[in-house]
Each structure stands twice: as C-alpha cells, then as structure tokens.
Regions:
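N-terminal binding-site loop/beta-alpha segment at the start of enzyme catalytic domains
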Residues: 1-77
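A short acidic, helix-capping loop that chelates divalent metal ions and anchors anionic groups
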Residues: 22-27, 86-92
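A short, structured active-site edge motif that brings together acidic residues
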Residues: 75-88
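Glycine/proline-rich, positively charged
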Residues: 92-110
Length: 110
C-alpha cells in the first residue's frame, strides 16, 4: 500500500480509502457482521483512511463503523466525514452553519 502525507501534519494516509457508505445500506441491504468484517479486512490490508457520513443510511453507516472501530487500535486509521446534509425517514435537511457542523461532529462521536 502506498501512503502520502497530508501537508506537513505527519498524517500518512493510504492511497486507497474505505468508503463506508455501503455500511449504511445505501446501495443494498448489508448484514452488520459482513460490514464489520469488511472494515477489518480493509485496515488489515493497509487502508487507514475511512470516509463516512451521518447521512449514509441515516446514521446506520456510522453505527456499524463504530462497532468495527471499537475493536481496532486508534492509531490504525483516520476518519473523514461530511457535514451539511442530515435527515431521517427520507426527509432531507440542509444546514451548513458552523453551529450545526459542530453539533454533527459531536453527534457522530456518540
């Protein structure tokens, strides 16, 4: 696996990243255990950059990803997320304010 440093941060991320949208059932139904295994496999094979969003499966992707990451050493991965689009039950809410973005980060940590 090839890695590149992000600026001068010292963070070296893999050229390939794990896109966690499928963990939320965005494309098809997924068994939670299979999703967790996919995360383990990605990290075991050198992927250390994981992209997720609270909107993927209306928080489901974050929930499944969180279950997988609890079992992995914290220094094995970096997380990327998105802000601005929220919603449950098919309703969309758009809010790009700084206040809502900060709230979203803390919601994701729960």
């Amino acid at each position: 696996m090839n890695y590149n440093e992000i600026g001068k941060t010292g963070m070296r991320v893999s050229n390939l990243s794990f896109g966690a949208s499928s963990l939320g059932g965005v494309f098809h139904d997924i068994r939670e255990a299979e999703g967790i295994k996919a995360v383990y496999t990605a990290v075991e094979n050198g992927m250390n950059f994981i992209d997720v969003s609270p909107y993927y499966g209306h928080y489901k992707a974050e929930t499944v990803l969180g279950k997988a990451l609890k079992e992995l050493p914290r220094d094995k991965y970096y997380l990327s997320t998105k802000v601005g689009r929220y919603g449950t039950d098919g309703a969309n809410t758009w809010d790009y304010s700084g206040t809502r973005a900060t709230e979203s980060v803390y919601e994701s940590l729960d």
